[in-house]
Amino acid sequence: MKIYVDADACPVKDVIIFEATKAEIPVILVTSFSHYSNAEQPKGVETIYVDSGADAADYRIMQLAQKEDLIVTQDYGLASLALAKGCIVLHHKGYKYTNENIEQLLQTRYLSAMVRKSGKRTKGPKPFTAEDKEKFRALFKSMIAL
C-alpha cells in the first residue's frame, strides 16, 4: 500500500505523514508548483509537483495509484475514478468514499453547479474543525491498520 494525497488544500497532511511514518507506509504528496516548498519531509514521504492547471494533481495521482492504495482527496471526481480502480479513498473530514455514496455526492455537485450557472448562490462547505481532524485521524488509522 502507498498513500497518495491530493495535497494542494489538504488540512490533514500532518496527520497523514505522522501516522503513515509510524506505520512505515510510503506517502506521496501530489501538489502544484504554486505550492512549492523547501520543507524537509521525513523518510518515506515524497512530494511530486505538477503544473498548476485544473486537475493536474488528479491526473498524476490516477497515473500512479494502484489497486488497494489509499488516496486522500476532497475531489469527488478523483474519488470516483480511484474507487473504480480499486483504491481506498478518504475525505479529509473523516469519511470514506464508497461505491454506494459517490453517485449521490457527484449528483449533489452537479446540481449545485447548475444552480450556480443559473446565477444563484449555493452554500459552501462548513469550516474544517478540530473534531473533523480527529475523526479523520481515527478513520485513517483504521484504514492503514488493515
Curated annotation (Swiss-Prot):
InterPro entries: UPF0178 (IPR003791). It holds the Pfam family DUF188. It comes from the Bacteria. Belongs to the UPF0178 family. This is UPF0178 protein BA_3063/GBAA_3063/BAS2849. It comes from Bacillus anthracis. The lineage of its organism: Bacteria, Bacillati, Bacillota, Bacilli, Bacillales.
